[in-house]
């Protein structure tokens, strides 16, 4: 019975667009986020006026994850920023089980707490990546 249910997920992923993608076609920085973080990321990019240098891939649901589209997005980016409100970087770990998320070009901005992300937090990380300032990668 479970196998039958999971086969239905594949059909859903093939039939519907399960993600939002916006920004540059060949981005310097690709941002991966989901849920409420997507709106904050969109606000930060608009405020910085870097739509021509940054792109965002935001799955609407994480299961089924649109793995083919996500991998194509990852491959098109020079560097990646994963944004999430989770100290343990659960979204990042989930992505790594589904796609090739190269550690060498991936920066993870994760933190705990009940407070939502701010556009200023995202802007700080994007500025760092766009100016090639190195940062310790924790996840």
Task: State what each model feature region is.
Residues 1-20:
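Conformationally flexible catalytic loops at phosphate/diphosphate-handling active centers
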Residues 80, 84-139:
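Peripheral docking tails and interdomain loops at the edges
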């Amino acid at each position: 019975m479970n196998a039958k249910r999971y086969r239905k997920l594949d059909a859903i992923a093939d039939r519907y667009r399960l993600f939002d993608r916006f920004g540059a076609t060949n981005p310097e920085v690709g941002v991966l986020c989901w849920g409420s973080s997507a709106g904050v990321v969109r606000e930060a990019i608009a405020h910085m006026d870097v739509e021509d240098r940054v792109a965002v891939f935001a799955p609407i649901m994480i299961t089924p994850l649109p793995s083919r589209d996500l991998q194509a997005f990852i491959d098109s980016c020079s560097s990646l920023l994963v944004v999430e409100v989770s100290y343990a970087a659960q979204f990042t770990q989930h992505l790594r089980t589904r796609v090739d998320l190269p550690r060498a070009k991936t920066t993870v901005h994760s933190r705990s707490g009940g407070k939502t992300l701010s556009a200023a937090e995202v802007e700080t990380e994007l500025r760092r990546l766009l100016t090639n300032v190195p940062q310790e990668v924790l996840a």
